[in-house]
Amino acid sequence: MSDSIIVFDKVKKAYGNFTVINELDFEVRRGEKVSIIGPSGSGKSTVLRILMTLEGINDGAVYVGGEPLWHELKNGSMMPATEKHLRKMRTQLGMVFQQFNLFPHMTVLRNLTEAPRVVLGLSKEEARRRAEELLELVGLVDHAHKFPAQLSGGQQQRVGIARALAMRPKIMLFDEPTSALDPELVGEVLNVIRRLAAEHDLTMLMVTHEMRFAREISDRVCFFDKGRIREEGTPEQLFSQPKEERTREFLKAVLDG
């Protein structure tokens, strides 16, 4: 576990009688780019939500940077770490959601500067300088004083990526970042993620239905089915020579569809 920045150890997550994550063992190494693929309802997005403590777990253990996110109580229930501990942990994680989740009443610039000032204690000047650098990275420096409603979906998602990066995370989580976009806007978001993967020393974990993109940027691809990893390997291994029949069925459906 020494080189793994994310560890799931026999994690279980259920809603009543429906098990979403089924004794999941899963690790991501520092600096690794990992894509999670699989059918709807297989637990892909739940993995990211657990990492952000947006969802709890019923059993097992989750570690980020070697530190536990959850503690088991004497009665067997799972409780998150202390709020102080979680605040520290969350600064290591940046998440890009499907639906952008920008603050609609704030300009693009303020969307990027608010959390670094409040949470990290950056000065107004430091936060602004960092925000402008990130807007340059995502190609939106000329839109700094617009409000989210004045932007296209693709532009809003690029702001979402910049906002996550503004907290200087070690890990970036992407939850199907193009699923809410019109087809013609997908490319501009993928180009930003592609640049991050190539130029920045970030650990990246991405849930995606963009198979060709996952194949291009990933060090490893994991196929989820029924709350577990059914198969994993390099993009070449998993896409060209999948071992499991269920993996072959899924890839045939999504690539030929």
From Swiss-Prot:
Source organism, top-level taxon: Bacteria
InterPro entries referenced in this protein's UniProt entry, alphabetically: AAA+_ATPase, ABC_ATPase_HisP-typ, ABC_transporter-like_ATP-bd, ABC_transporter-like_CS, Ectoine_EhuA, MetN_ABC_transporter-like, P-loop_NTPase
Keywords for this protein: Amino-acid transport, ATP-binding, Cell inner membrane, Cell membrane, Membrane, Nucleotide-binding, Plasmid, Transport
Location in the cell: Cell inner membrane
Binding-site residues for ATP, renumbered to this chain: G38, P39, S40, G41, S42, G43, K44, S45
Pfam assignment, any one: ABC_tran
Function: Probably part of a binding-protein-dependent transport system y4tEFGH for an amino acid. Probably responsible for energy coupling to the transport system.
Gene Ontology MF term list: ABC-type amino acid transporter activity; ATP binding; ATP hydrolysis activity
Principal location class: membrane
Topology versus the membrane: Peripheral membrane protein
GO CC aspect terms: plasma membrane
UniProt domain ABC transporter: residue ranges: 6-251
PANTHER family reported in the protein's UniProt record: AMINO ACID IMPORT ATP-BINDING PROTEIN, GLUTAMATE_ASPARTATE IMPORT ATP-BINDING PROTEIN GLTL
Similarity annotation: Belongs to the ABC transporter superfamily.
Record's protein name: Probable amino-acid ABC transporter ATP-binding protein y4tH
UniProt keyword Lipid biosynthesis present: no
